Amino acid sequence: MARILIVDDAEFLRMRISKMLLAEGYEVIEAENGLQAVEKYKTEKPDAVLMDITMPEMDGLTALKEIKAFDAKAKIVMLTALGQESVVLEAIKSGARDFVVKPFERERVMSAITKLLA
């Protein structure tokens, strides 16, 4: 089954998403900021990334750009809070395949991952 890198500075969200994905048979890798995300992407080579935009140390947009520079084919879905439309547009222009608005429903996350891996 596919390996998914979950990147969010909120531990409870990482745990919630991890439980969802593990229940569906996915392998999960976690990072708590963009800097860790870039490092783990390079070393763990996940099949997809689900990444928050607003994080300490390195934000999700910067991490997205660094990951895409390393691997142009990287499959990334961004997590965003309501009201960040301009940031979402920048993420899509920078190579994100989709976005999920927080708070989210399980079905929306699973739909985004399924489409990403199709």
Predicted segments, located by residue:
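Charged docking surfaces used in two-component/phosphorelay signaling
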Residues: 15-23
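Short hydrophobic/Thr-rich beta-strand motif most characteristic of the beta2 strand and flanking loop
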Residues: 25-32, 40
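Acidic catalytic/metal-coordinating carboxylates
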Residues: 33-36, 59-62
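Active-site beta3 strand of CheY-like receiver
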Residues: 44-50
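Receiver (REC) domain active-site loop signature in two-component systems and cognate sites
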Residues: 55
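C-terminal output helix
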Residues: 86, 104-114
